[in-house]
């Protein structure tokens, strides 16, 4: 990969998953004994990305402790959103202030990222650079998603 930096959005309250998220941040919810955050980091690691920034707000100490206990290959920096939640755009802007990179991958750990998504991300990166795009968004057809039977604003 040409892109060496990834941002992971982990600051939200996880209200849609209450009561599960009353005591644990949504990125640390586990499926098959692996948190969705770890699944996301494993995908990023498989892409050979060198540095990851994770923004935090709600139950941020749990995310920091989780990262500190693991031995992930990429350098991981935790960015605190401060006294007020910055929402998606503000969180991204805040994290971008911590890197000199112009090209970054942005991940939402709400999505269950499997390693087999790396093919799509690599193809997306090729298109991004070949067409000299300013940004590009990866979407998955809802019929192919894991949550196609769930209702909600997500």
Feature map (PLM): residue ranges:
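Conserved N-terminal catalytic core of the sugar/cofactor nucleotidyltransferase
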Residues: 1-8, 30, 34-108, 112, ...
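A generic secondary-structure signal marking the coil-to-beta-strand transition
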Residues: 4, 27, 103, 134-136, ...
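A phosphate-binding catalytic loop at a beta-strand-loop-alpha-helix junction
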Residues: 4-20
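Active-site loop signature of alpha/beta-hydrolase-fold enzymes
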Residues: 13-16, 61, 114
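Short Gly/Pro-enriched turn/cap motifs at secondary-structure boundaries
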Residues: 19, 84, 144-145
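Short alpha-helical oligomerization interface
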Residues: 22-26
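Conserved core of the sugar-phosphate nucleotidyltransferase
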Residues: 114-154
């Amino acid at each position: 990969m040409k892109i060496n930096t990834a941002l992971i959005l982990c600051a939200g309250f996880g209200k849609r998953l209450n009561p599960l998220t009353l005591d644990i941040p949504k990125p640390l919810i586990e499926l098959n004994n692996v948190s969705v955050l770890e699944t996301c980091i494993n995908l990023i690691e498989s892409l050979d990305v060198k540095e990851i920034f994770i923004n935090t707000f709600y139950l941020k100490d749990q995310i920091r402790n989780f990262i500190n206990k693991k031995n992930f290959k990429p350098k991981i920096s935790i960015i605190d959103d401060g006294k007020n939640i910055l929402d998606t755009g503000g969180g991204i802007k805040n994290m971008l202030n911590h890197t000199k990179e112009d090209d970054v991958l942005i991940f939402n750990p709400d999505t269950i990222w499997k390693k087999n998504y790396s093919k799509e991300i690599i193809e997306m990166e090729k298109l991004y650079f070949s067409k000299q795009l300013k940004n590009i968004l990866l979407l998955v057809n809802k019929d192919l998603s894991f949550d196609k039977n769930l209702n909600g604003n997500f």
